Amino acid sequence: GDPYVLMLERLALPSLGSSGSAAEHLGDIDPRSFPALDVDIESLSIGDKNYGRVGFDLRTDLFGAHFLALRGQVLGIDLGDASRQNALHWWYQENGRRGSQLKGKFAVRDMGKVLSSLGYERSLETRSGGFDVNVSWPGSPDQWAMSASQGRVKFALKNGRFLKTSDAASGALRVLGIF
């Protein structure tokens, strides 16, 4: 049948906390059981942090859940609009193993603001940039870890400069250096 349509002006979720219990519960979910949904949230916050505007079309099949047509702007990253092929896949295998994949082209204006929103020191600033991503990792989407990821990330940042920062900011620059 037709997907349910969910349009929210605001969605405020509690902080996940440091216990990790919420992540353990997500790992127990069979992503194939989700209903078909077209979701648009104007303002998403988790705990005290506002993530921005997000939307997706959720579909499931025998292989898992597929968050298609990612759209909106989250933490300064432009997810695109419904016409793009940006997607997050949550795979399910019969042996109970799960995996996730993020695939698409995403844009940023000021990479410094993105770094800051992710908890890093603002070590560079840009006027524009883009990322072409095809990355997968074991587990549910919230279990992403760079060390467990495989795939490719291509990026181009334009009209920018590195800023003088503390030694702590070198961690963010090392992240860029990995790619």
Predicted regions and their residues:
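Small-residue helix/turn framework positions
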Residues: 3-16, 31-50, 55-179
